[in-house]
């Protein structure tokens, strides 16, 4: 009696047949960009012995994207009000001051200034 074909074998055969139909080209998986590696690096700097679940990472990624979009939109609005066609670090700084509350804005501005200084000095 011959062995029964497993579900895995059937799936492999189906995928091979599909690849043959599409002109023998394997479809490359589309790259999904995220901030997860940077969030993980910051987590390890702050709490070296703490991990993060994929759900929590997804939430953090959404949070970073949301804040990025808010700052970009506010900076764009500020540039438009002042009839400027370029968003500079000044617009970003003002947008951060407008969007973030009190002490958080002060820390964000100082960290941003530090990052820009480090970048310009390394050039």
Curated annotation (Swiss-Prot):
Residue segments, region Disordered: 1-32
Cell inner membrane in keyword set: no
Keywords noted in UniProt: Chromosome, DNA-binding, Glycoprotein, Isopeptide bond, Methylation, Nucleosome core, Nucleus, Ubl conjugation
Glycyl lysine isopeptide (Lys-Gly) (interchain with G-Cter in ubiquitin) crosslink, residue number(s): 118
UniProt-annotated location(s): Nucleus; Chromosome
GO molecular function: DNA binding; protein heterodimerization activity; protein-containing complex binding; structural constituent of chromatin
CDD domains per record: HFD_H2B
Disulphide bond pairs: none
Sites bearing N,N-dimethylproline, chain numbering: 2
Similarity comment: family membership: Belongs to the histone H2B family.
Subunit structure: The nucleosome is a histone octamer containing two molecules each of H2A, H2B, H3 and H4 assembled in one H3-H4 heterotetramer and two H2A-H2B heterodimers. The octamer wraps approximately 147 bp of DNA.
Protein name in UniProt: Histone H2B
Organism: Sipunculus nudus (Sipunculan worm)
Taxonomic lineage from the root: Eukaryota, Metazoa, Spiralia, Lophotrochozoa, Annelida
